[in-house]
Amino acid sequence: ASREGLSCVQVGNSGGLLFASGLLDLLAVHPARSGAASLDPFAAHAALARDVPDHPLARVDGASIRDAFAAFVAALAGAGLRYAAPSERNCSVATSIGTIKTTYAVPRTMAAGADALASRPACLVVGIRGLREFSARQFVAAFGDRWPGLRHVEIDLPGTEAAAELYAAHVARDLEARAARDRTIALV
């Protein structure tokens, strides 16, 4: 809208969640009763338009959706939030609790994880001792039967060895510094 010279107002939920996933969804499940995720969002969109012509998404053509996503991803890049270029396909990402989420576009920082889930190479999942919101052991337990060669290790984040509990927001802030990332990587 801003690109077209329109006035913009951002409206959001002021809930208690500190984080959003950063994933950009298009359409992964249609018909909803099937519960089956589709890797082709545009085929799902065409089926939605055929099956539920009054649905708001059915009123927008595929080319306009592609253009809108491209413009949105470009605007995010202009704000320093880089995304892997959306393609014609959805991708799957592993969640921290061992489930799989189908989505359309991922931040570049998550693209390697989506690629790894698709190809399932031998991988080491690194957990941080004391981190409350993620367990590498739980992740491997959830995916182990579907991902041969997946293993885990737990490390102490440099400078936090005495902390009983760590929170993702603090760890993320610490790891923004290249030196902190380098020290952490050296432990693995």
Predicted regions and their residues:
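Conserved N-terminal glycine-rich FAD pyrophosphate-binding loop of Rossmann-like flavoproteins
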Residues: 12-53, 160-174
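Predominantly flavin-linked oxidoreductase catalytic cores and closely associated redox partners
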Residues: 17, 103-188
